[in-house]
Swiss-Prot record:
InterPro entries registered for this protein in UniProt: Aminotrans_V_dom (IPR000192), Pser_aminoTfrase (IPR022278), PyrdxlP-dep_Trfase (IPR015424), PyrdxlP-dep_Trfase_major (IPR015421), PyrdxlP-dep_Trfase_small (IPR015422)
Example GO molecular function: pyridoxal phosphate binding
Binding site for pyridoxal 5'-phosphate: 104, 163, 188, 211, 253-254
Binding site for L-glutamate: 42
Name of the protein this chain belongs to: Phosphoserine aminotransferase
Organism of origin: Bordetella petrii (strain ATCC BAA-461 / DSM 12804 / CCUG 43448)
Function: Catalyzes the reversible conversion of 3-phosphohydroxypyruvate to phosphoserine and of 3-hydroxy-2-oxo-4-phosphonooxybutanoate to phosphohydroxythreonine.
Length: 376
């Protein structure tokens, strides 16, 4: 049976080669006679799996030794609480700043409010004229030179790819140039993690839920500058204290072992595709194909300011919304799955993560073209 093209925003498609290897090793990992799901998290077999996954991730992103790499539980939303519990009080008065560009940065801001004094440094939550064009809320990124970052903040948080609204930062700002040299950047990179090169040293902390580009739901990767950890709030659970997790190499408590194993297979798959530079080239080609067609017709519309359009998550609407149900039914019949947009914005969304080949995007564009011929 042919597998359909899965455009889910997450949990998302995994590389077929990874799924096949996991199936082959399900009952016996590397001659151990055990499934990874049956291993002690402190036994030599899983220690080997976990340490190799960390080594491969460090290699892919060029993570230096003065940064800790941690595999944690709780997902991206959980990390929105774990980050402030670990960092917000590191300079005494608990304070953190946020750049709001969509749903997930807004959720992060709200969650951090439980732990200290939070401040909006910039927001795209209102309509604005950008490059001479009127942009709706959450379809643009405030220029960095307009951000109001407090020099006393413990960190500045941004979501570098908004999964729902389809907005992506093309670069991360230099906070020293904004008058805040002592404020580290915290980046939620969940939905474009490993999709392109990222200079992790530009951030004090980066985190990413695996279920977009790096594996199944259940594990979150955290890359943190070591001098920032060890100052958790007293209320922080010990299992979520970065100092504990880093000291025990992600095995302070029982980790999500199978999810880490799959993530490790994905890391090796990414390396085999040419690393993050190879993934960037492939992802650029896919995005250019899809956006190119959407921009060529008035039948569909992507509302995001072109320079900050996400290569991973492509929201679009049909000009005639009465056709939405017919569009989705036809897409499923054509083997194009999970194209319905998020309930908060409606319309459609095609998530074209690393595991989606160019062939799948071509199939989507052909369907878009055919549907327009029939209903346009």
């Amino acid at each position: 049976m042919a597998r359909p093209w899965n455009f889910s925003a997450g949990p998302s498609a995994l590389p077929e080669a990874v799924l096949q290897q996991a199936a082959d090793e399900m009952l016996d990992w590397n001659g151990s006679g055990m499934s990874v799901m049956e291993m002690s998290h402190r036994g030599k077999h899983f220690v080997q799996i976990c340490d190799q996954a960390e080594a491969d991730l460090r290699d892919l992103l060029g993570v230096p030794a003065d940064y800790a790499v941690m595999f944690m539980q709780g997902g991206g939303l959980g990390e929105n609480a774990i980050v402030p519990m670990n960092l917000i009080g590191r300079r005494g008065h608990p304070a953190a700043d946020f750049v709001l560009t969509g749903h997930w940065s807004t959720r992060s801001h709200k969650e951090a409010g439980r732990y200290g004094d939070i401040h909006v440094a910039a927001s795209a939550g209102e309509a604005a004229s950008v490059d001479g064009r009127e942009q709706a809320p959450w379809t643009w990124v405030p220029p960095a030179d307009t951000w109001k970052v407090r020099p006393e903040a413990a960190y500045l948080h941004l979501c570098s790819n908004e999964t729902i609204h389809g907005v992506e930062f093309t670069d991360w700002p230099d906070l020293a140039a904004l008058g805040a040299p002592d404020v580290p950047l915290v980046v939620d990179a969940s939905s474009h993690f490993l999709s392109r090169p990222m200079d992790v040293t530009r951030a004090g902390l980066l985190f990413a839920g695996a279920q977009k580009n790096a594996g199944p739901a259940g594990v979150t990767m955290v890359v943190a500058r070591r001098d920032l950890i060890g100052k958790a709030l007293p209320i922080c659970p010990s299992a979520f204290d970065y100092a504990n997790v880093a000291a025990e190499h992600s095995r302070y408590n029982t980790p999500p072992a199978f999810a880490i194993y799959i993530a490790g297979l994905v890391f090796k798959w990414v390396k085999a595709q040419g690393g993050v530079a190879g993934m960037e080239a492939a992802n650029r080609a896919k995005a250019e194909l899809l956006y190119g067609y959407l921009d060529s017709t008035s039948f569909y519309h992507n509302p995001v300011h072109a320079p900050v359009r996400s290569r991973m998550n492509v929201p679009f609407v049909l000009r005639d919304e009465s056709l939405n149900d017919a569009f989705l039914q036809g897409a499923e019949a054509a083997g194009l799955m999970q194209l319905k947009g998020h309930k908060s914005v409606g319309g459609m969304r095609a998530s074209i993560y690393n595991a989606m080949p160019l062939e799948g995007v071509r199939a989507l564009v052909e369907y878009l073209r055919d549907f327009e011929r029939r209903y346009g």
